[in-house]
């Protein structure tokens, strides 16, 4: 149980002690009616297989007989949410006759759908509502690496949550930065980046790339500026986008020089306050 949470919360601990699991749980409960999130948290770690055994990875000790249960009380003291994730395994009723004649007969033949179900319960001002959504992989979908998603009927998520993983994709930052540039708000980003690299004069989007002016004859891709600059950009544009929402940052100091850590934290604290964002950060480095 996590209690007395604040606007900015730091999870500190050694490797493999469960810090990322806490962030995963927060991500799931923030989008409790979205079954895709159970797949997304694995893809954040560059693991995107959807075989039956892979769906067990989020269960404690790989034991799916015990559902994943997550609950959260909201700040207003009047609402709460509960999420239970249980596996789904069902025999398929439709048999492909063409496939059947091509294979050797066996009395153990099966055609199975698998996936999981999200049971979501929301309490607001004493009024309780229940929703159900699911993700199902059919035999055909398994071959194509596709899943069928059945969203919760009549429910629209009100919480905006973003997850910045250690393996963050800079392309996501490009999408967010595009919105910032359209609103002429990029000076907030540039001011923070200049504290790490004073040569940066401005920032813009090129052909699917973030370009910066560092005083050379032409702008250069931010990709060549090092991991630290890219990580800081990913964090601050995500905070900028997530007004009145939640941002989860796993291994915040990964790839960042220790001298730049205070700059990053200053940006996190100021932008969290300015945009009313609740932030959860993990690190294994006590210096952070």
Question: Which residues does each predicted region cover?
Answer:
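Switch/communication elements of ASCE P-loop NTPase nucleotide-binding domains
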Residues: 1-37, 211, 219-288
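Phosphate-coordinating catalytic segments in nucleotide- and nucleic-acid-processing enzymes
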Residues: 32-240, 246
């Amino acid at each position: 149980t996590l209690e007395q949470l604040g606007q900015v919360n730091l999870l500190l601990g050694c490797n493999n002690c469960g810090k990322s699991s806490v962030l995963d749980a927060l991500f799931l409960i923030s989008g409790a009616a979205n079954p895709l999130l159970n797949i997304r948290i694995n893809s954040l770690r560059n693991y995107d297989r959807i075989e039956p055994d892979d769906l067990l990875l989020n269960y404690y000790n790989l034991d799916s007989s015990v559902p994943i249960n997550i609950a959260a009380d909201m700040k207003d003291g009047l609402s709460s949410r509960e999420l239970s994730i249980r596996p789904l395994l069902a025999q398929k009723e439709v048999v492909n006759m063409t496939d059947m004649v091509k294979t050797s007969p066996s009395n153990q033949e099966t055609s199975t759908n698998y996936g999981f179900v999200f049971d979501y319960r929301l309490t607001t001002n004493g009024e309780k509502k229940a929703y159900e959504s699911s993700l199902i992989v059919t035999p055909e979908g398994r071959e194509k690496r596709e899943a069928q998603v059945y969203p919760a009927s009549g429910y629209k998520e009100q919480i905006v949550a973003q997850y910045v993983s250690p393996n963050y994709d800079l392309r996501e930052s490009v999408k967010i930065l595009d919105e910032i540039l359209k609103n002429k708000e990029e000076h907030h980003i540039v001011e923070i980046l200049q504290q790490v690299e004073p040569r940066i004069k401005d920032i813009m989007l090129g052909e699917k790339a973030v370009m910066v002016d560092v005083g050379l004859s032409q702008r250069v891709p931010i990709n060549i500026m090092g991991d630290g600059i890219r990580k800081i950009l990913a964090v601050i544009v995500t905070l900028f986008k997530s007004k009145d929402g939640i941002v989860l940052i796993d291994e915040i100091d990964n790839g960042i020089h220790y001298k730049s850590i205070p700059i990053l934290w200053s940006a996190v604290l100021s932008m969290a306050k300015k945009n009313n964002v609740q932030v959860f950060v993990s690190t294994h480095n006590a210096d952070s």
